Regions:
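N-terminal helix-loop segment corresponding to the beta1-alpha1 unit
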Residues: 7-183
Length: 183
């Protein structure tokens, strides 16, 4: 059978600036990042929020989503729409063998790549800094992770609730001198 990558409508026109952007709320005013091309492999909130700010400031952002889309697409909230306006989107199964050609073309095209995987995941998917910068040495690579790239908890998934708990925020709920209450 044909993999998801082979089914993607991927034209040379795209790489000549012929993108279509949904929910474009930019104006013709101050756009200091105009002309900068961002390849966004991130999902949920931290990475998409960072690239949203770049898009609002004029950068062209291409959001790379897995088959089925960014996890935030399926949440019943404004999270996805609110953090992904002014971006183009493409579906790529990064685990598929034929994804390599698309990844290569994205790396050649982009000025910046951003991902939000736990350490080691991007390398396994073929989108790590060494892999992409071998294609485009000028590519700026941004890696976001909840607990850094090294250290004892670096491989743990980073989410808001974990940060609140580790900072003692959850212990604040309840009565003084009693065990914390559960929600």
């Amino acid at each position: 059978g044909t993999s998801m990558c082979a089914l993607i409508a991927w034209s040379d026109k795209y790489f000549k600036g012929g993108t279509s952007t949904v929910n474009d709320t930019r104006n013709d005013g101050w756009q200091p990042l105009k002309g900068l091309k961002i390849i966004d492999f991130s999902m949920l909130l931290p990475g998409p929020l960072a690239t949203l700010i770049m898009a609002d400031l004029g950068a062209e952002v291409i959001k790379v989503e897995p088959p089925g889309g960014d996890y935030a697409r399926h949440m019943k909230s404004f999270l996805f729409e609110g953090s992904n306006r002014n971006k183009s989107s493409i579906v790529v199964d990064l685990k598929a063998p034929d994804a390599k050609d698309i990844i290569k073309r994205l790396a050649e095209y982009g000025d910046v790549a951003i991902e939000g995987f736990r350490p080691g995941v991007a390398d396994r998917l073929g989108i790590g800094p060494d892999q992409l910068q071998a294609i485009n040495p000028a590519l700026i690579y941004c890696s976001l992770s909840g607990f850094g790239q090294t250290g004892p908890i670096s491989t743990k998934a980073g989410h808001d609730l974990a940060y609140i708990a580790m900072g003692g925020g959850l212990a604040q709920k309840g009565q003084l001198r009693q065990a914390p209450s559960r929600s």
